[in-house]
Amino acid sequence: MSRSLKKFVSILLAAALLIPIGRLAPVAEAAENPTIVYHEDFAIDKGKAIQSGGASLTQVTGKVFDGNNDGSALYVSNRANTWDAADFKFADIGLQNGKTYTVTVKGYVDQDATVPSGAQAFLQAVDSNNYGFLASANFAAGTAFTLTKEFTVDTSVSTQLRVQSSEEGKAVPFYIGDILITANPTTTTNTVYHEDFATDKGKAVQSGGANLAQVADKVFDGNDDGKALYVSNRANTWDAADFKFADIGLQNGKTYTVTVKGYVDQDATVPSGAQAFLQAVDSNNYGFLASANFAARSAFTLTKEFTVDTSVSTQLRVQSSEEGKAVPFYIGDILITETVNSGGGQEDPPRPPALPFNTITFEDQTAGGFTGRAGTETLTVTNESNHTADGSYSLKVEGRTTSWHGPSLRVEKYVDKGYEYKVTAWVKLLSPETSTKLELASQVGDGGSANYPSLASKTITAADGWVQLQGNYRYNSVGGEYLTIYVQSSNATASYYIDDISFESTGSGPVGIQKDLAPLKDVYKNDFLIGNAISAEDLEGTRLELLKMHHDVVTAGNAMKPDALQPTKGNFTFTAADAMIDKVLAEGMKMHGHVLVWHQQSPAWLNTKKDDNNNTVPLGRDEALDNLRTHIQTVMKHFGNKVISWDVVNEAMNDNPSNPADYKASLRQTPWYQAIGSDYVEQAFLAAREVLDENPSWNIKLYYNDYNEDNQNKATAIYNMVKDINDRYAAAHNGKLLIDGVGMQGHYNINTNPDNVKLSLEKFISLGVEVSVSELDVTAGNNYTLPENLAVGQAYLYAQLFKLYKEHADHIARVTFWGMDDNTSWRAENNPLLFDKNLQAKPAYYGVIDPDKYMEEHAPESKDANQAEAQYGTPVIDGTVDSIWSNAQAMPVNRYQMAWQGATGTAKALWDDQNLYVLIQVSDSQLNKANENAWEQDSVEVFLDQNNGKTTFYQNDDGQYRVNFDNETSFSPASIAAGFESQTKKTANSYTVELKIPLTAVTPANQKKLGFDVQINDATDGARTSVAAWNDTTGNGYQDTSVYGELTLAGKGTGGTGTVGTTVPQTGNVVKNPDGSTTLKPEVKTTNGNAVGTVTGDDLKKALDQAAPAAGGKKQVIIDVPLQANAATYAVQLPTQSLKSQDGYQLTAKIANAFIQIPSNMLANTNVTTDQVSIRVAKASLDNVDAATRELIGNRPVIDLSLVAGGNVIAWNNPTAPVTVAVPYAPTAEELKHPEHILIWYIDGSGKATPVPNSRYDAALGAVVFQTTHFSTYAAVSVFTTFGDLAKVPWAKEAIDAMASRGVIKGTGENTFSPAASIKRADFIALLVRALELHGTGTTDTAMFSDVPANAYYYNELAVAKQLGIATGFEDNTFKPDSSISRQDMMVLTTRALAVLGKQLPAGGSLNAFSDAASVAGYAQDSVAALVKAGVVQGSGSKLAPNDQLTRAEAAVILYRIWKLQ
């Protein structure tokens, strides 16, 4: 027992001896309850006391008086004023605002002191302007005094305690022998389980023969919402409703209060003596808890406090007495609460004050207390190198074989708990000579539950000499009296020196948590569990307070990993993990198990061995599989149902796999993979499932867990793996899943695109498994510093994520943060969490707590993407800057992605009909490629999105091309290397890269836009220290094309008038293009703002004669009408006969505000008789459009298309010769996130706006493109229509929204779509005709089906479908329009409709992959096979379900897929 504790106990014993015997027990009980917040006996120094006024404070000994038996005291002398005193600051002694404490001060006045009459000691709460009296006691010479008072801290009026005197005693010196401050623990009532039956039966299960049904509109006292559980069909007392302890979270040995609100109907027959009973039961025991009388039309309440004893009962039952056994009743509400301490508790034994730490210099030629962490390192005091001024020695560290090996020093005796310390070590790398990362860290606690916070790290070389590592850490826990500091290296064999190690307090004392914050777990209690990753230090003191306040589930950071639980074969070490789990459960939280199978933090013996040459080789499959199964099953059985879920396998998938369709090839080549094979993941889950099958009462979910899951290639590979494993298992086990859930780790950074997170989340949800966000953190800033703008950005991303999670809450079980505060995070240098190192909320907390509010108040500034042009021309790829580059636009590569601003440069681009050419000139005098990672070498990268799709993930046309200064290349994906060429040249201060990229996914042409970026990687001493780009500042270009700039192809066909490009032959005003088309430049005249380009018959003939047929057999003529000054209207005048021709050619009018593709038969079968016609484009007026429509159109382009003949506008409508129009439009960044919602509205003469279903945004053209068979007014718009009942069909939401926005489909209500409802045959035909904009043959004598009335709302669409041969009906001339349509009939109708449009589906499709292929009717087999091969139909799991009724959601998806085929 320490001296302080002895003295405190003696005080209590002395007080007890003065109390009458009858009152002893209550006082003793009270003495056990308070928590000691601060206790000082001045045994060593002045403690936390500071001088007030002119007083002198001196620590003395030998001053024994009543209450101060050890004689140590603080002497307060040199007093001339009342305020010449001793102060104790609240912040220093751990007092928190709003909390109530009891202060007791024991003091004394010397026997020879002069004490005036009325002199008193005062205890006050003060600051510089306020003086709050608390207590007083008389001064008397040779006499002790006691000051005691309970008070509540209010930091707005006082900041410290002061022990002073009254005015009469202002000159009296005195002693303080002891100051004790305690707090009574407060209690709070936690809700453990609450069910109001608002949506279903909750956790209630049937007992006996009772029927349980969820009902509404049963309002009674205590059940205002009317939702209730109806318990009927009762004939026995036990025909009742049960609530299993395990299901509702009740734990053995804990005490709860249960309250049940019930009701009996007015017309119920209620025998005399009938009662409701609440019991705790199992199959053999029935423990009565409470009763209440049944009465017709009356509510009843059952309530009881009880303690769970699982040896005699396993569930609660709401039943009846014998007399009431036939009475049906309602349960409107069941509430179970637990009363727990919300603060206080048992105080740890007082620790001795921290000892002073003397800087360790090794000048005494000893190791200064340092030892090897593994015990195998060689630590030598040496004079080979030294850092100490005027010194000679340092400690040399050698013999390391693993990254965590290194010198370690115990420091717990130098720590005052709760204080922050600055730790410094000087290091010098010995070997290797190349760059190596050295890290200064601390260990808190021993064993599997320890924590290892990083304090500082630097990447250095041997040439750097001595380098300082320094960082701060607050020791809220002393780790069970085990604290160390150590130096390690990511290079497992690196050797180094250390010197001048210091460890000093910063003076920042214990901190409290913010009790006035909204607990995260409460905010999301109706959505998902909120979790955190913990070590042992998080289960005590202030950290435990924060953990319990905000979280209801935890994950062990290290304590349950394989190396912690089975370090050697058969030696299971559960002690630390057991202690952690027991503590977690005792504190009312749940536990998630992490992890059973992982390639890291697993002992080598599990899957490898040494061969005869001492090389590490894989174990044989059988032995490794036995080790895997034994570990999984032993661990799971040991912990049993103390956990709610397990990460069975962790991080098995490669990052960004190039072929995610082959998930087995995408797996990491881990030791488990090498020993067992690609099925090791499945084998692990099979072993885990066996344990659960043996213990059916355990409600435990089995998870696959992985990181970088926002990368779409990786997410697809994970999806394919889980789907394959689950589908095969389900087929053999009656639909049961093997893998219950996917853990999305969520280790993100401030530039993570949440759209990618959403794509992955919805992908995993579509598997039918639950999802957990398992290890969430978001890095921002560096070097332990977080600027305000980055803090806001970090919070904004957290807000975006939690908005996303809440939208998908039905499928998310828990969201777990990977750490509570920045200081203890494994990514501490980058400040990734919601709370700072002092446990105070950051902006990130507020982003999480109210995402919508935070995003509204902190909307980020949008930044336009860089734009540039690439000129037409073909350079020689030799690394030399030829003259052809001279007029190419220079793109500065100077947007930095990292704090350090290093190498920069410029880029230029050229193009021809096959390739893109890029020249990058880099200014950099120190070139380095020491790192084996290509991206950490001095290099350039070109990012290319050929279709300019701006997707947040890579499509087949996207690529990353990397070339270092020595012309060594790397690619992502690897397949894009084909046809790539590059050359480099170096000078003393720069290097040049010239490269050629084949344009394989697009046809290069003027005005074609490519997504494009250039990046320069600057390496120093084997590490990338700077990244500069032309456009992207996020660093996500390797997976996200939305961050690229835009490169527009230009200059083709200039005829040699420029210095860049290829000269093409031309005759007069006709230019022949390399692709075989011709460009005709007509004479243009502008009159009164009307620009008309006139094409004569001779002009057109000349252009057609020079044009060569394209791949489709048609000749192409481009009519180029350039911009004209002061022109508001543009027209192209053509010979009328040129548009009545059946010859195969196509005209494209390229004018200022539109591109119009005109078929040669545009005017066929029309009665236009003039010699010339003009196609005119003008900016349209919206005067006849209502205000709401005008507002929706906004400032987007609106054009009026018209056909003019003889000076008059004539109506044109030709369904057989559609015209294609492209309206240039630059969408906003927000619109580009959902380009499928950019479309065209047709505006008729009355101002009514109707969507054009075929319209869509073409990113490559930078225009909204549509086909029309009539001319009118058209407007570009962005329309987003959605419905509120799509949460359960995330796989269909994009399709439903896109089709609804185009007016193809409509909802069943204002905000409902009814996605699960079946769809009628007539309705599907109508949707099909509308989506594909099908037109009839023009005949009016088509006989309709006999069961279709002429006034049917779908009549016109069905008539079109019948005329076109799509709808053939049944043999009796009926169509059965109101019958539900089967999936196979849908497929037949769809293939017929596509055939009408001339869309050829691929032949030779096979249905062998589907288990129910034999169920497809003969008439439907070809259609089904064709749609499967085209990707329009994908089936559900391994089934086609051809005879199932088509749902509205499925119909929308099919329509969307065929719409995209157009």
From Swiss-Prot:
Pathway: Glycan degradation; xylan degradation. Keywords: Carbohydrate metabolism, Cell wall, Glycosidase, Hydrolase, Polysaccharide degradation, Repeat, Secreted, Signal, Xylan degradation. Optimum pH is 6.5 with sweet gum methylglucuronoxylan as substrate. Residues 64-165, 207-319, 360-490 form the CBM-cenC domain. InterPro entries: Carb-bd_dom_fam9 (IPR010502), CenC_carb-bd (IPR003305), Galactose-bd-like_sf (IPR008979), GH10 (IPR044846), GH10_AS (IPR031158), GH10_dom (IPR001000), Glycoside_hydrolase_SF (IPR017853), SLH_dom (IPR001119). Residues 514-851 form the GH10 domain. PROSITE patterns: GH10_1, GH10_2, SLH. The active site is at E651 (proton donor), D706, E775 (nucleophile). Optimum temperature is 45 degrees Celsius with sweet gum methylglucuronoxylan as substrate. It is found in: Secreted, Cell wall. Gene3D superfamilies: 2.60.40.1190, Galactose-binding domain-like, Glycosidases. The keyword Phosphoprotein does not apply. GO terms for biological process: xylan catabolic process. Its EC number is 3.2.1.8. Belongs to the glycosyl hydrolase 10 (cellulase F) family. Catalyzes the depolymerization of methylglucuronoxylan (MeGAXn), a beta-1,4 xylan in which 10% to 20% of the xylose residues are substituted with alpha-1,2-4-O-methylglucuronate (MeGA) residues, which is predominant in hemicellulose fractions of hardwood and crop residues. Generates xylobiose (X2) and aldotetrauronate (MeGAX3) as the predominant products of MeGAXn hydrolysis; these products are then directly assimilated by the bacterium for subsequent metabolism. Thus, allows the bacterium to efficiently use polymeric MeGAXn as a growth substrate. This is Endo-1,4-beta-xylanase A. It comes from Paenibacillus sp. (strain JDR-2).
